[in-house]
Swiss-Prot record:
Location relative to the cell: Endosome membrane; Lysosome
Bilayer disposition of the protein: Peripheral membrane protein
Species of the source: Dictyostelium discoideum (Social amoeba)
SUPFAM superfamilies xref list: Band 7/SPFH domain
Family of this protein: Belongs to the vacuolin family.
Entry GO CC: early phagosome; endosome membrane; late endosome; membrane; pathogen-containing vacuole; phagocytic vesicle; phagolysosome; vacuole
Lineage, opening ranks: Eukaryota, Amoebozoa, Evosea, Eumycetozoa, Dictyostelia
Name used for this protein in its record: Vacuolin-A
Domain of life of the organism encoding this protein: Eukaryota
Amino acid sequence: MIEGSGSKTPKRNSDEISVKSLSIHEANTLSSEHEHESGNEELTLSQIVIRSDFANESSERQSKIILDRFNQGIGKNSAFTDSPALGRGLSRVDVSYFVMGHRNQVAELYDPRGQRFSTVLTPDPTVNIKYVGPVSKTAHYFGAYGKHVLNVPAGHYAKAFSKNRPVLYGEGPHVIIDPTFQFDENNGFVNQQEPFIEHSTINILRIPAGKIAKVWIGTQPHILESRRDPYVFVDAQFKLVSPDGAKKAQLFESSSCTFVEHGSIKRIIPHTGEVAITYNNGILTIIPTPKDGKPVIIDSPTHNFEGFISTSLQTCLFPSKETKQQALADNKSALADEINLKIFQTRDSLRVGVVLVVAFKIVDPELAITKLGKEGIINHIENVSFADMGKAIQLSTLQEIMYFNSIKPGQATNDDSVQTIQDRVKSHLARDLFDYGVELSRLQIETMKVLDTEIAKKLAGQSVTSAEFTTKQATLVKEYDIKTTEARLKAETDNIALEQRNKAIISESQAKLSSAQREAESLLITAEAQKKASELQGELYTKYPILAEIELARIKAEALKNATLYITPQDAGAFMNSPLVYFDKMMNANNTIQQKKN
């Protein structure tokens, strides 16, 4: 089959030559007999899907290419003419249509472009020219006599056959010259985004994120992980295994499944806090949680997966559910206490029923499974726990058991040498379980019941009395706490008030001290100023003695300011020569000197 190919053609104009110069593709038909398995190279979509080499051309260009490729080898012997004889013109067709005819079953396309046309009239009886009819230029498929045009819609593939082998065409127009070409227009197109495209021996798988696919190729199983590019297989022995009754959207398994088995392949994902149990040719193999976060893949028909076992802390109540069911099966008339409790006899011959709480962790899974088996670990822990607890109860009186049961395992007591029954049993049981790869974390009597009715009533009465005493004691303690709290609050309030008063007194004293200090500093400054003034005045009087005399006269004048002078006639002459007569002048001169100093 050849797309757009042909035998020798007559000379054409430059436009026709440029059209033919486009790449010519021969359909890639692959054998299903494992020819593609040479080497490790995988097939890709580009190897099996035939691309259109003129899908991106303009509509006019595409029409011309289709005409030239479809009509290769016809040359001047066209079956159509645009100059019809009178009365031979055919019905006009829209410009969006080709018309198709044939000359002796050699198909031909013609584009009348809305003009009149007709078939060629020939007198040769050996030439048979027929008009087939109009075909839309955008029709998905048309053709006749080994010539075909295929217009694949966007986002689709076209499934066809050539030489009885499947072929796939990509979106866009294709011209196929092939007498063995087969195409079913009703079922031939498929969406490119389908998760699984199957076309005879061609298989395309698109595995969504979070999914895996289980497939067979011949007798070999494969588990395919999700990836961006699709998987492509051309093999008649390819088979996709999907869950029973699965629809197209459910063809795949979840990639988060902890265990997926497909033929001899086992895909295991142990979670944190557990390990996988496998047997490789009968030899126990423990698979821990992978550090790289990837699934563990085992491809061996003799390496079998048994299950998972927890390595994190587990807490169990004994008797277990299975033990209770077995007790009921053994004795249909058994009482509820005989089923729900494990019954022991004390040293003073009293029957008590207990429920144990055991917390443990498997630290060596290989050792534990080797010695006990996967299903026997819990049973062994239950049996040895009851065996050790029963031995301890048989060696103790009811009073001792009740006393020790009121103290939790590991709780501090006044006597360090005293151990509870749980502690004694735990230490012995821990050593026993360690030999089997199990670490005991806790052992405690969860429930204890005296089965003797009369003794149980007496114990109940004692419990009531003890409860009343405990309640009264708790009330007294509470009242004491309240009184203590009130006294403490009052003392704290008084202390706060006293502190506030002390702070006020201290603040007032500090204020008075500061005021006195400032007043003393002021007096010192004043005295110092007066001292300096006196020193300056003394220096002035020393330098200018006349000023001292003037000052002395001023002092005398001040002393005589309010005095009354009585002058006798005989003293009048002496008074006129006295300095007192010039007192006013002296005072004025003194004032002038003082102003200059200032």
